[in-house]
């Protein structure tokens, strides 16, 4: 298969993975309207082409939370990444480090913090949910500190799990799910050998370390459902701000008022995100939500965005809408499933090249120059940019 874009990696991942894993990563909540709009709304954004601008001094590098990034991209926290490739979190982290960008480890990763951090030569980020088990949260924060994690990403848009109908059809959940998953693995022998057998253990490493016993895929949904806390508020995060002295980013912001609350709380950054369309179907795409949020808080904290980003062109679009950087989620998991560390490195190379082309043809010499001026007048006046 010729690989020239993230869509090619998606097709390769679907061919390699058992359906329950592919659709768990690929799917969204309910009828998946928001999932689709995340992509289509970005595609609808027209850029303003400029020519004869002498683009010989182009630079993609940027500063974020005291770190120098080769481009304004970080790998997003994605649960169960270690089920998509053998010790997948380690492979993805190495790919990110090789391309000079941060990797964010999920709370519900297969590989624990202590396995991933020593595998790379740059600090990583760590994502944490707000859970009922505050002892787990404190333990995770202590371990993150000990491992040299620099930036903490708090996901706040999961006080309850989303309803993902596709999971019931694919075998991730629903009747006879364990049997269906086993049968699917048998019909995908390459994955079964490389990941299913050689990729063990398949525990949720960060949780198993805390509980002192394996917490595998069978326990995943139940443990999370029991620990998500619908009572959380900004006040509940105050002890975390006192405990964690490094940069802290609040992930899951879609409303300008919530963004202002994040500023008042003292967050160093936010992620404009609808969880990749996996939580509440029918909410705004990140691309539609971003401009109003940028108008409200730009300059008071760093603004990151995710959901729907599939190319370097999409990265430029998000920056033009007001983001300082983006998180890349599904796209890197497609590449990881299809080609491991090399696949992720190649995807990041493609994104960098696409960014360069877009910046040259919009006349923007640096990441700092990318602004609303890079958008066409038609786009600025259209409903896609509120």
From Swiss-Prot:
The protein's Enzyme Commission number: 1.1.-.-
Chain sites annotated for binding substrate: 24, 129, 164, 278
Mode of membrane association: Peripheral membrane protein
UniProt GO cellular component terms: plasma membrane
Active site, per annotation: 275
Role of this protein: Catalyzes the conversion of L-lactate to pyruvate. Is coupled to the respiratory chain.
Family annotation (NCBIfam families): L_lactate_LldD, PRK11197.1
Recorded family membership: Belongs to the FMN-dependent alpha-hydroxy acid dehydrogenase family.
Name the UniProt record assigns to this protein: L-lactate dehydrogenase
Species in which this protein is naturally found: Xanthomonas campestris pv. campestris (strain B100)
Organism ancestry: Bacteria, Pseudomonadati, Pseudomonadota, Gammaproteobacteria, Lysobacterales
């Amino acid at each position: 298969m010729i690989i020239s874009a993230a869509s090619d990696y998606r097709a390769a991942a679907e061919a390699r993975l058992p359906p329950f894993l592919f659709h768990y990563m690929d799917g969204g909540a309910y009828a998946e309207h928001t999932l689709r709009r995340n992509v289509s709304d970005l595609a609808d954004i027209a850029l303003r082409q400029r020519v004869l601008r002498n683009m010989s001094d182009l630079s993609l590098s940027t500063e974020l939370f005291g770190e120098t990034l080769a481009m304004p991209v970080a790998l997003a926290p994605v649960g169960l990444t270690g089920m998509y490739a053998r010790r997948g979190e380690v492979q993805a982290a190495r790919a990110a480090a090789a391309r000079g960008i941060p990797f964010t480890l999920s709370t519900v990763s297969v590989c624990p913090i202590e396995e991933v951090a020593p595998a790379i030569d740059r600090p990583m980020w760590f994502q944490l949910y707000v859970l009922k088990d505050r002892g787990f949260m404190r333990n995770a924060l202590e371990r993150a500190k000990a491992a040299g994690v620099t930036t903490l990403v708090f996901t706040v848009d999961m006080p309850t799990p989303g309803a993902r109908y596709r999971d019931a059809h694919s075998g991730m959940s629903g009747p006879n799910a364990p049997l269906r998953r086993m049968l699917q693995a048998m019909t995908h022998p390459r994955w079964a050998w490389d990941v299913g057998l050689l990729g063990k253990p398949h525990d949720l490493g960060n949780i198993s370390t805390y509980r002192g016993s394996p917490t595998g895929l069978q326990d995943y949904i139940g443990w999370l459902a029991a620990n998500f806390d619908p009572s959380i508020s900004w006040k509940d995060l105050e002890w975390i701000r006192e405990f964690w002295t490094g940069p802290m980013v609040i992930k899951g912001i879609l409303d300008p008022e919530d963004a202002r609350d994040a500023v008042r709380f003292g967050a160093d950054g936010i992620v404009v995100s609808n969880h990749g369309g996996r939580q509440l179907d029918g909410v705004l795409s990140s691309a539609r939500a971003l401009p109003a949020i940028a108008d409200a808080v730009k300059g008071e904290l760093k603004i990151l965005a995710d959901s729907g980003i599939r190319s370097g062109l999409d990265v430029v679009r998000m920056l033009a809408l007001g983001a300082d950087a983006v998180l890349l989620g599904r796209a890197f998991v497609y590449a990881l499933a299809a080609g491991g560390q090399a696949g992720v490195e190649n995807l990041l190379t493609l994104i960098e090249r696409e960014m360069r082309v877009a910046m040259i043809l919009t006349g923007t010499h640096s990441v700092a120059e990318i602004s609303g001026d890079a958008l066409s007048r038609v786009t600025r006046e259209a409903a896609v940019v509120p």
